[in-house]
């Protein structure tokens, strides 16, 4: 029994993943003088979260957020439900209040590549990402005010402008290591004055 491989089954590694393995890993190992190659920080996952507070009043609003996140990330998001009831917000336990997607592996690398090279430069008056949003363990979280900057979103079909939070989780132990990794991957940080 022989296994046939066709052109369609050949898997191409994402270009940012290849660049990380070939160049960035070696540079970071030299910069931080790691003894073992496994000490070099790497990306673990990217979480894209879209909070939709209006979904408490109108349950159809969540469908637009799910559709947008599916187009942006390439996978179906999980609907986030309220954990407890809050009377002031007219919110009951179990109501949908957002959607989130966790990207790992090749999808994560492709998303980060598209985010850095295509989406972020399309933001109006964009001067770079703040370098102060690291959590102390090398993970970075930032927010986007609208979904329009992604090429996958048809600008004429937008029913509502929605923002999102993007968290990049790394194996870095300190913020400096995380910042060096993300800068090498192409994240445009503001210069600290």
UniProtKB/Swiss-Prot annotation:
Gene3D superfamilies: 3.30.1440.10. GO terms for molecular function: rRNA binding; structural constituent of ribosome; tRNA binding. InterPro entries: Ribosomal_uL5 (IPR002132), Ribosomal_uL5_bac-type (IPR020930), Ribosomal_uL5_C (IPR031309), Ribosomal_uL5_CS (IPR020929), Ribosomal_uL5_dom_sf (IPR022803), Ribosomal_uL5_N (IPR031310). Pfam families: Ribosomal_L5, Ribosomal_L5_C. SUPFAM superfamilies: RL5-like. PROSITE patterns: RIBOSOMAL_L5 (PS00358). Disulfide bonds: none annotated. One of its GO terms (biological process) is translation. The keyword rRNA-binding applies. It comes from the Bacteria. Keywords: Ribonucleoprotein, Ribosomal protein, RNA-binding, rRNA-binding, tRNA-binding. The keyword tRNA-binding applies. Signal peptide: none annotated. GO terms for cellular component: ribonucleoprotein complex; ribosome. Belongs to the universal ribosomal protein uL5 family. PANTHER family: 60S RIBOSOMAL PROTEIN L11-RELATED. This is one of the proteins that bind and probably mediate the attachment of the 5S RNA into the large ribosomal subunit, where it forms part of the central protuberance. In the 70S ribosome it contacts protein S13 of the 30S subunit (bridge B1b), connecting the 2 subunits; this bridge is implicated in subunit movement. Contacts the P site tRNA; the 5S rRNA and some of its associated proteins might help stabilize positioning of ribosome-bound tRNAs. Part of the 50S ribosomal subunit; part of the 5S rRNA/L5/L18/L25 subcomplex. Contacts the 5S rRNA and the P site tRNA. Forms a bridge to the 30S subunit in the 70S ribosome. This is Large ribosomal subunit protein uL5. It comes from Renibacterium salmoninarum (strain ATCC 33209 / DSM 20767 / JCM 11484 / NBRC 15589 / NCIMB 2235).
């Amino acid at each position: 029994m022989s296994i046939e491989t066709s052109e369609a089954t050949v898997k191409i590694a994402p270009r940012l993943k290849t660049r990380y393995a070939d160049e960035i890993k070696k540079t970071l190992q030299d910069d931080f003088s790691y003894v073992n190659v496994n000490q070099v920080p790497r990306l673990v996952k990217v979480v894209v979260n879209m909070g939709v507070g209006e979904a408490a009043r109108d349950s159809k609003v969540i469908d637009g957020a799910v559709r947008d996140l599916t187009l942006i990330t390439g996978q179906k998001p999980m609907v986030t439900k309220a954990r407890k009831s809050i009377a002031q917000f007219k919110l009951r336990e179990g109501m949908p209040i957002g959607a989130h997607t966790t990207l790992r592996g090749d999808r994560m690398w492709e998303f980060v590549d598209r985010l850095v090279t295509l989406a972020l430069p399309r933001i109006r008056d964009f001067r770079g990402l703040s370098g102060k949003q690291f959590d102390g363990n090398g993970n970075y979280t930032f927010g986007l005010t609208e979904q329009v900057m992604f090429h996958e979103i048809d600008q004429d079909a937008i029913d509502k402008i929605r923002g999102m939070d993007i968290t990049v989780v790394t194996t870095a132990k300190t913020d400096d290591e995380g910042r060096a990794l993300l800068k090498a991957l192409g994240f445009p940080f503001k210069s600290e004055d």
